[in-house]
């Protein structure tokens, strides 16, 4: 996974012709962060047939992006063809929101905006209005799974971030002796208002990753309780 470095990109090509020209601001549909300023509406852009992404032509339209680099991805397309995508993420929550075919953003002809990733309405005023992020998923049987990144040996138990990829939780206990798991379960029980018997902790995809499976709450309820508990 490439290291993500945050940048603010802008393209002054095809700037509006005067002070009365319309500008459209688009926000991340998940967290409400500002992502794109352009002089055309999203619904008027052509769509790719392969993934239904909106195609923004930088040669004819303004494209001011506020994103971070998400790395290069190779995708298999039909007839053995490979497609190269240089992905860009929302700065606020790191959700994949758009991509380009060329490595250099300034010389790229087109920006492809992921279908459904952006909104003309900012959700910043009320984060609870944002969609439930992918790290909190509804499972069969009424269960909800939460992807957690655990930081051990912290000063105290706390939730410090909720984004698309995971919920970051700090615990005071060291991870090596397994004490961190017990502290994590007890803390999450207090945050979610659940008993230990209503939660199961599973291994994730690396040493810091955990998967918490909970009962008797919906994904939306879990998300809202976690948001309320986040500390700066």
Swiss-Prot record:
Main localisation: nucleus
Subcellular compartments: Nucleus speckle
Subunit structure: Interacts with CTN.
GO cellular component: nuclear speck; nucleus; spliceosomal complex
Keyword Nucleus attached: yes
Keywords: mRNA processing, mRNA splicing, Nucleus, Spliceosome
The protein's role, per its UniProt record: May play a role during early embryonic development. Probably involved in pre-mRNA splicing.
Organism the protein comes from: Arabidopsis thaliana (Mouse-ear cress)
Entry's family note: Belongs to the UPF0235 family.
InterPro entries: DUF167, UPF0235, YggU-like_sf
The UniProt record lists the keyword Transport: no
GO biological process: circadian regulation of translation; mRNA processing; photomorphogenesis; positive regulation of photomorphogenesis; RNA splicing
Coiled coil residues, start to end: none
Protein name: UPF0235 protein At5g63440
């Amino acid at each position: 996974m490439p290291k993500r470095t945050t940048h603010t990109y802008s393209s002054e090509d095809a700037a509006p012709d005067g002070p009365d020209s319309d500008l459209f601001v688009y926000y991340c549909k998940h967290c409400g962060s500002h992502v794109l300023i352009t002089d055309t509406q999203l619904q008027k852009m052509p769509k790719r047939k392969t993934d239904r992404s909106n195609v923004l032509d930088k040669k004819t339209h303004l494209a001011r992006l506020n994103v971070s680099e998400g790395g290069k991805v190779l995708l298999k397309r039909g007839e053995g063809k490979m497609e190269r995508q240089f992905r860009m993420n929302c700065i606020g929550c790191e959700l994949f929101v758009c991509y380009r075919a060329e490595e250099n953003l300034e010389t790229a002809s087109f920006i492809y905006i992921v279908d459904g990733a952006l909104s003309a309405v900012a959700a910043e005023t009320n984060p609870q209005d944002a969609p439930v992020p992918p790290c909190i998923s509804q499972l069969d049987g009424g269960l909800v799974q939460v992807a957690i990144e655990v930081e051990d040996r912290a000063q105290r138990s706390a939730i410090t971030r909720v984004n698309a990829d995971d919920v970051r939780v700090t615990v005071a206990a060291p991870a090596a002796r397994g004490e961190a798991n017990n502290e994590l379960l007890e803390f999450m029980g207090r945050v979610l208002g659940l008993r230990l018997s209503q939660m199961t902790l599973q291994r994730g995809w690396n040493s810091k990753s955990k998967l918490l499976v909970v009962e008797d709450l919906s994904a939306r309820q879990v998300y809202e309780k976690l948001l309320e508990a986040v500390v700066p």
